[in-house]
A protein has these predicted regions:
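Short, low-structural-confidence N-terminal segments
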Residues: 1-76, 174-227
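Hydrophobic membrane-targeting alpha-helices
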Residues: 17-21, 98, 150, 154
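N-terminal targeting/tethering segments
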Residues: 25-135
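Charged/polar, solvent-exposed surface patches and flexible loops
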Residues: 45, 49-52, 109, 113-117, ...
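Proteostasis/folding factors centered on peptidyl-prolyl cis-trans isomerases
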Residues: 125-159, 203-227
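Acidic/polar surface patches and capping/hinge elements
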Residues: 135-137, 154, 158-188
Length: 227
């Protein structure tokens, strides 16, 4: 089953940091990621397609529930499909930049192979819907998953002989993710929260998040709203 098996490990490797992305976003944009502008209109259209497709895949909700029961972090936010979709779109773009900067790429053949190994496109579609995106992003999602797996393999996360070596490798990849976010000048519209690099998720939506001091770092490295 296609999942993001290294997300929790990378979040742990980033513990203690409080790097967030939230700044002045141009009118009409949900997020700016380098030269990519995710408009609010595009985000709403994406969520609309997702909501129409979801009932056709009963297994999608089951996949999300099983992942949560197993203690895995699933970025799907039932209270805000827009935040779920925006997170996925931003996350894929950041990983693309990590791969580009490190010379790691994924071919169409690799994507096809993973789809075949995981039960075909219908299974992948259900997994993608469980993550909050419509099926038109299925191949992009698989490509992103394979890309991060290639990076983990390259830096020894999956081949480490001991926990210390694995942690060091994770921290190296986590640092690459942070630097990619900085290079891209990742900027999220405050109405959707701020991007929390420690947890690799969108942080809370703060009523006054547009103010520089409204997102406050917590002792765990995340971000909370001021009272």
């Amino acid at each position: 089953m296609i999942r993001k098996p290294f997300k929790i490990m990378i979040a742990a490797a980033l513990a203690g940091t409080a790097l967030t992305a939230c700044g002045p976003v141009k009118t009409g944009a949900a997020a700016l990621v380098g030269n990519d502008r995710i408009t609010i209109a595009k985000l709403n259209s994406t969520v609309d397609k997702w909501s129409k497709e979801l009932p056709k895949y009963p297994g999608a909700q089951q996949i999300a529930q099983q992942a949560q029961a197993q203690g895995q972090q699933v970025p799907f936010d039932p209270s805000s499909p827009q935040r779920s979709a925006l997170y996925q779109l931003v996350d894929m773009l950041v990983w693309d930049e990590v791969g580009r900067a490190d010379g790691v790429s994924v071919s169409g053949g690799q994507v096809d192979a993973i789809i075949a190994q995981n039960g075909g496109l219908s299974t992948i579609d259900a997994n993608v819907l469980a993550q909050g995106l419509p099926t038109e992003y299925s191949r992009d999602y698989v490509k992103s998953v394979v890309l991060r797996q290639e990076l983990m393999r390259k830096y020894g996360v999956t081949t480490a002989q001991d926990q210390q070596s694995q942690q060091q490798a994770l921290q190296q990849v986590a640092g690459m993710y942070q630097r990619a976010g900085r290079r891209l000048k990742l900027d999220v519209n405050p109405r959707y929260g701020s991007f929390d690099f420690q947890h690799m998720a969108l942080g809370p939506v703060c009523p006054t998040l547009s103010k520089p001091d409204s997102g406050t770092p917590t002792t765990s490295g995340g971000v909370s709203c001021q009272a």
